[in-house]
């Protein structure tokens, strides 16, 4: 499976810091063209960079500022979106809250005495949920990824199979008609894909800067979401698409 192989290549590179193309080809038993395509995908994801004869990892410390920057961009809009979406959380719900700089505001507007279940891979959601007296909390993911402040791991899907999720609150770095909801992190994309395929309802929380954009990896078709929470009326094509597919839009 390509996604699993790329995940394993990423893990290998992060552990060893550098690798030659031939070393990777032999280790993963694929053709030179296949390994080059895999490398190009990791380069596009800003995980590795090409050097003479091979690749080397881009350290997370060089990318951490990106999260901090995202966290302050359109911060007021993200709070408004969080408040709008919080109205969807009801007693006895079993919900998934995605990692992201918009979804982190969701719990700020929920009654702290409400009884419901949260499943998440977000460190920020974990910290906020700990303040809720009547919440049952499940954390997925085998290792912590500082750049996204999330827990990741390819085996998370095995745990997710056990959960019946009625509402998923998702984030995205791109929202458009052709490529749906997208992001740029392979490990997170696998979890997002599984969650949106399993949840009864999928809600996207995304500000206007994400609309019309597409990034590396699609995890959900736009037609598969149930509600969109944003800060401005979406572009005409997206708004018309939502009307056509009975997707409620809140802003």
Over which residues does each language-model region extend?
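Ser/Thr-centric signal marking residues that sit
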Residues: 34, 101-103, 117-120, 182, ...
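Conserved phosphate- and dinucleotide-binding cores of soluble alpha/beta proteins
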Residues: 11, 18-24, 44, 77, ...
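Active-site metal-binding loops of divalent metal-dependent hydrolases
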Residues: 100-101, 208
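HTH-adjacent hinge/linker in prokaryotic transcriptional regulators
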Residues: 2-8, 14-22, 27, 33-99, ...
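Alpha-helix N-cap/helix-start and coil->helix boundary motif
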Residues: 103-104, 123-126, 235
